[in-house]
Structures are given as structure tokens and as C-alpha cells.
Amino acid sequence: GFITTSCEQAGYANNRKEENKLIANFFSRNGFNIITEAPENDVWGEKDYLQVPGYDDFYFHLTTRGDSIRIDSIDGKADTIDLSVVPNDLIVLRYKRFELTENADTISYWTTLEQAYPYEFHYGNLAECEATGWHLAIKLMKYPNSECTIIQPSKMGFNADVNSVTPYGYISKFKVKQ
């Protein structure tokens, strides 16, 4: 009853503290720089990670800026089409997940050999993809064919991550399915 709930809450709070230490140690061990503003023109230093405002323990690094526009030529007339991701776009995601420990395991869903079908969900639809970290990463990447690395706390991951209070890093890329 009451005592169990109280102990569970204390255990969760301690696990969150350990999780925050694990994230801090990961950054320290790898010599990453924590920045508080995204670089202008999407030119990121190799070791720069944005501590996303409003999400103190979510970190983002843009590796490759994707395709912001497409130019279509119809009837000899060029049309510029903005490719920014909008809510309900069907996202096709490939990723490599890694633990933040010193001898980390990596699980890869990067190619069709590793995972026949990529992870798909509609951007902004938390019923399809409960991992709020993915939605935030897509928002920050903005454009299809972008690649990034994120470090996210368990509370922003999949339900299994939340329950185990395990933070992960993800190297990810996405496309918008037409």
C-alpha cells in the first residue's frame, strides 16, 4: 500500500539522480561541449551538443543538415518547395541506439540488413510514438535527410526506457514518406 508507493517514488528519484550522473559522466568522458544556443547557419562544432531550452537533460547535435527545399520545374518554370517537416508527416526513422556507460552496447536499426523495415510514425502523434525525444529531435532537425545525435533521459524515451530509468544516445536520420 502506502509504504510501497513511497519507497517506489524514492527509488525512482534515486534512479533519476543516477541517470543524470551517467549523462554528465558521458559528456565529461567524451570531451563534449554543452552549448545553450544552436549555432548560426547550422554549422556545428564536432563536439557541440545543444542543451535544449526547456528540456534540461535532452541534448542535440546536428551532424548533417537535410534538404530544406526542392526545386521543381514544371512547364519550364521553377517552383521552390519548402521541405520543412510539419505535424502528421509520416516519418521514416533509422537509428543506432547506444548506452552511455563506458563499455556501451549499441543496437543498430540503420540498414535493411539490421532491421528490414525502418521505424515509422506520424510526426506529432504521441499515440503512435510515445518517445517525446524523437518528436523533439525531428523538430530540431527540421528537414528530411538530416542526421543528428541525441542524448535523452529515460522519461523522453520509449515506455521500456522510462520504466527502467535508462538514458540512451541515438544517432538518427529520417526521411518523410511521400
Label the predicted regions.
Residues 7-70:
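Acidic/polar, low-complexity intrinsically disordered N-terminal segments immediately downstream
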Residues 1-7:
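Sec-dependent bacterial lipoprotein signal peptides
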